[in-house]
Amino acid sequence: MPARLEVYYRETVVPKLMERFKYKSIMMVPRLEKISVNIGVGEAAQEPKLLETAMQELGQITGQKPQVRKAKKAISNFKLREGQAIGCRVTLRRKIMFEFMDRFISVAVPRIRDFRGLSDTSFDGRGNYNVGIREQIIFPEIDIDKVPRINGMDISFVTSAKTDEEAYELLSLLGMPFKKKNQ
């Protein structure tokens, strides 16, 4: 059974985008290709247990086993050696991606403190959107009492859109709560 947001995309979003941008074929309509969730734990160089808890939390949030990310080069000021584990990442595709985005938009984002909308300036010029989250406890899968340290995370929404305008329209039609243009 397809995810709720995936069905909504096919039945509602695609026709609206075809009408708005005058696409001749359904294959020209931008689509969400993947979502990448990354947690950087710089302190893992001194305390490896922090990386383990971050990986466990990321696994709970996404439902997928995280991949360990290692330092590309040594930086002595940060007491960091090349090849040292300093973060974790998950790449979500297809059904799991739509389910995560649905939970992110409808459950997690409304739990952000003093939330007034996501910034619409975080597009990269190629139709991809990046958002930084300051606390992992906005996700209901995380038990606040068992969190030893508040971690932030970076979430990248990779789309097949050619321009930022197309990507903005796609994500806003999918329900992404952007700030109003006049604010």
From Swiss-Prot:
Leader peptide range in chain numbering: none
GO MF annotations, alphabetized: rRNA binding; structural constituent of ribosome; tRNA binding
An example Gene Ontology biological process: translation
Keywords from the UniProt entry: Ribonucleoprotein, Ribosomal protein, RNA-binding, rRNA-binding, tRNA-binding
Stored Pfam families: Ribosomal_L5 (PF00281), Ribosomal_L5_C (PF00673)
GO cellular component: ribonucleoprotein complex; ribosome
InterPro entries tied to this protein: Ribosomal_uL5, Ribosomal_uL5_bac-type, Ribosomal_uL5_C, Ribosomal_uL5_dom_sf, Ribosomal_uL5_N
Keyword tRNA-binding set for record: yes
The protein's assembly and partners: Part of the 50S ribosomal subunit; part of the 5S rRNA/L5/L18/L25 subcomplex. Contacts the 5S rRNA and the P site tRNA. Forms a bridge to the 30S subunit in the 70S ribosome.
Function recorded in the entry: This is one of the proteins that bind and probably mediate the attachment of the 5S RNA into the large ribosomal subunit, where it forms part of the central protuberance. In the 70S ribosome it contacts protein S13 of the 30S subunit (bridge B1b), connecting the 2 subunits; this bridge is implicated in subunit movement. Contacts the P site tRNA; the 5S rRNA and some of its associated proteins might help stabilize positioning of ribosome-bound tRNAs.
Family: Belongs to the universal ribosomal protein uL5 family.
Entry protein name: Large ribosomal subunit protein uL5
